[in-house]
Swiss-Prot record:
Name this protein carries in UniProt: Proteasome subunit beta type-8
Species of the source: Sus scrofa
Induction info: Up-regulated by interferon gamma (at protein level).
Gene field: PSMB8
Free-text function comment from the UniProt entry: The proteasome is a multicatalytic proteinase complex which is characterized by its ability to cleave peptides with Arg, Phe, Tyr, Leu, and Glu adjacent to the leaving group at neutral or slightly basic pH. The proteasome has an ATP-dependent proteolytic activity. This subunit is involved in antigen processing to generate class I binding peptides. May participate in the generation of spliced peptides resulting from the ligation of two separate proteasomal cleavage products that are not contiguous in the parental protein. Required for adipocyte differentiation.
Enzyme Commission identifier(s): 3.4.25.1
SUBUNIT field: The 26S proteasome consists of a 20S proteasome core and two 19S regulatory subunits. The 20S proteasome core is composed of 28 subunits that are arranged in four stacked rings, resulting in a barrel-shaped structure. The two end rings are each formed by seven alpha subunits, and the two central rings are each formed by seven beta subunits. The catalytic chamber with the active sites is on the inside of the barrel. Component of the immunoproteasome, where it displaces the equivalent housekeeping subunit PSMB5.
Family in the record: Belongs to the peptidase T1B family.
GO terms classed as biological process: fat cell differentiation; immune system process; proteolysis involved in protein catabolic process
Catalytic function, reaction form: Cleavage of peptide bonds with very broad specificity
GO CC term (a single one): nucleus
Keywords: Cytoplasm, Differentiation, Hydrolase, Immunity, Nucleus, Protease, Proteasome, Threonine protease, Zymogen
SUPFAM superfamilies xref list: N-terminal nucleophile aminohydrolases (Ntn hydrolases)
């Protein structure tokens, strides 16, 4: 909201992730443990970013964070296709979360 008031436009997904990345960079080395996914839709289309406690910022199509992420990646890697329907994508996401929480 503050960005909109200052700039007269909505913040892009890329700019929002850069803002979080810059904030986290200031706290690097302080023992924080954080991994965050920032996603949204702007003028450029859909955007997905991963930001961690060191301010590392990655753009990608698929991310998993947290202690069970290796289990989730196993499910996602085996079932991911670029032509997934919305229903198939939701099902894949649900299965990845179930496996990650069950195994973790």
């Amino acid at each position: 909201r503050l960005y909109y008031l200052r700039n007269g436009a909505r913040i892009s997904v890329s700019a929002a992730s850069k803002l979080x990345s810059n904030m986290m960079y200031q706290y690097r080395g302080m023992g924080l443990s954080m991994g965050s996914m920032i996603c949204g839709w702007d003028k450029k289309g859909p955007g997905l970013y991963y930001v961690d406690e060191n301010g590392t910022r990655l753009s990608g199509n698929m991310f998993s964070t947290g202690s069970g992420n290796t289990y989730a990646y196993g499910v996602m890697d085996s079932g991911h296709r670029y032509d997934l329907s919305i229903e198939e994508a939701y099902d894949l996401g649900r299965r990845a979360i179930v496996h990650a929480t069950h195994r973790d």
